[in-house]
Amino acid sequence: MASSVLARPGPSTVLPAMTRPPPPMAHRAAATPSFARSSQPQLTDDAVLALLANAEHTEAGEETTARGWCVVA
């Protein structure tokens, strides 16, 4: 009587790429935009310069941008 042996995946078993589970955080990282991954939002130097370039100066020394944002240096 022949008995069949089922192979179980183990350290020596190589599974095809389609049957491998994804790394634990890969699905979350792919679904999350890069700007949302950091704990605090950061403005780049170019973004700050663009805000300042579009600003209108007020008499109080503050700068109000075209969209109404107030930038205090």
UniProtKB/Swiss-Prot annotation:
Q: Which residues form the propeptide?
A: 71-73
Write the record's keywords in alphabetical order, separated by commas: Cell membrane, Lipoprotein, Membrane, Methylation, Pheromone, Prenylation
Can you locate the S-farnesyl cysteine lipid attachment residues? 70
Q: Which GO terms describe its cellular component?
A: plasma membrane
Where are the Cysteine methyl ester modifications?
Answer: 70
Q: Superkingdom, according to UniProt?
A: Eukaryota
Per the UniProt record, one Pfam family is: Pheromone
The keyword Cell membrane is assigned to this record: yes
Is Metal-binding included in the keywords of this UniProt record?
no
Q: Name one GO molecular function term.
A: mating pheromone activity
Primary place of residence? membrane
In the bilayer, the protein is annotated as: Lipid-anchor
Q: Which portions of the sequence form the region Disordered? A: 1-41
Q: Where in the cell is it found?
A: Cell membrane
Q: What role does it play? A: Activates B-regulated development.
Task: Spell out the protein name for this chain.
Answer: Mating-type pheromone BBP1(3)
Organism of this sequence: Schizophyllum commune (Split gill fungus)
The gene it comes from is BBP1(3)
